[in-house]
Amino acid sequence: MAGVVESVPFEGSPRPTIGIEWEVALVDKVTRDLSNTAAAVFDAVGDLRAWDGTPQVTKELLRNTVEIVTGVHETVGAAVEDLRGTMDKVRRAADPLGVDVFCAGTHPFAQWSTQQLTRSPHYDELIERTQWWGRQMMIWGVHVHVGVSHREKVFPILNSLLTTFPHLLALSASSPMWAGSDTGYASNRTLMFQQLPTAGLPFQFENWRQFEHFVHDELKTGVFEQLGGLHWDIRPAPKWGTIEVRICDGIPTHAELAAIAAFIHCLIVDLDQRIEDGEQPITLPPWHVQENKWRAARYGLDAIVITDADSNERLVTDDLMDLLNRLEPTAKRLGCADELAYVATIPERGASYQRQRKVAAASQGDLVAVVDALVHELDR
């Protein structure tokens, strides 16, 4: 039985800082299949640290993956420049190994059975518990942390943030293919990831004390051994004083990454301010949140989403434009107006899942060409 806790301290952040984690995949330059060479890449880049001591490259479950991590930043622009610098180092380290880097929610044709696991007590326990489903986690995402000042704001913000789940997923959806087949989904990663027992949508707790009771119960019954084992789509990160948004598929370009990170930053800061002003944040019933998640995973930018507790519906891109207009003043205050404005261009240019399908169609179904395109998109 795991140790239990009576309280979960939340180290509030005095400012709405931002940090980003970017999971990327290693692929062979010739075959374009996944390459289990992360250990060699880590050896080549060495111990990279951000200005605040944060490790900038970290291991993940599979040895075909590198996670690039920023330090704590005041602006999205600074965070993305941090990522760009580390990404350049990772690509230079991978190049002599015959390896390229790309980012998407899934690889178009790789097979899970050939992927090697990273050995660690945490990952060993995860695979022992989850077995076949755990071995299937050939997926990549982007996680955005935003600082929150007080623990009692966390769940009001988190619960309201769930109303924008489909917007964030539709914009970032980049996993239409799995093991050589088009799944028919914009984000197959989303449905794969929720198969893990501690993944999926968060519970909509009313306050921090309810969350502490939940953590106590989960630790006592051995559901997870420490809070890092809680893999919700949005979760509190008490150690850092942040809300961590983990909805997004892997994002293939720096420009899209900056735009979606700015969107998340603005959403959380806007909700924080509304709570300060005495407003009651808008929420959706859990059944609507669950349905919106599925619709965005299935239909992407063509999803019709449920917008309120009265079950009204709207095209996600129409609702998105109203949201962006509402957030413009917040973006100006946070210094990310240009990045937020870029969000509106993603539906015009096509989200990654749409671009991947377009490349596949133009190459008569050649999925190697899809990986080629994703590798080249990393320069954008």
From Swiss-Prot:
Per its record, what are the GO molecular function terms?
ATP binding; glutamate-cysteine ligase activity
Supply the Pfam families for this chain.
GCS2
* Swiss-Prot/TrEMBL catalytic activity: L-cysteine + L-glutamate + ATP = gamma-L-glutamyl-L-cysteine + ADP + phosphate + H(+)
In terms of InterPro entries, this protein maps to: GCL_type2/YbdK_subfam (IPR050141), GCS2 (IPR006336), Gln_synth/guanido_kin_cat_dom (IPR014746), YbdK (IPR011793)
Q: What is its EC number?
A: 6.3.2.2
For this entry, list what GO says about its biological process: modified amino acid biosynthetic process
Query: Which Gene3D superfamilies does the UniProt record give?
Result: 3.30.590.20
Alphabetically ordered keywords of this record: ATP-binding, Ligase, Nucleotide-binding
Family the entry assigns: Belongs to the glutamate--cysteine ligase type 2 family. YbdK subfamily.
Q: What does this protein do?
A: ATP-dependent carboxylate-amine ligase which exhibits weak glutamate--cysteine ligase activity.
Which named protein is this? Putative glutamate--cysteine ligase 2-2
Q: What is the lineage of its organism?
A: Bacteria, Bacillati, Actinomycetota, Actinomycetes, Mycobacteriales
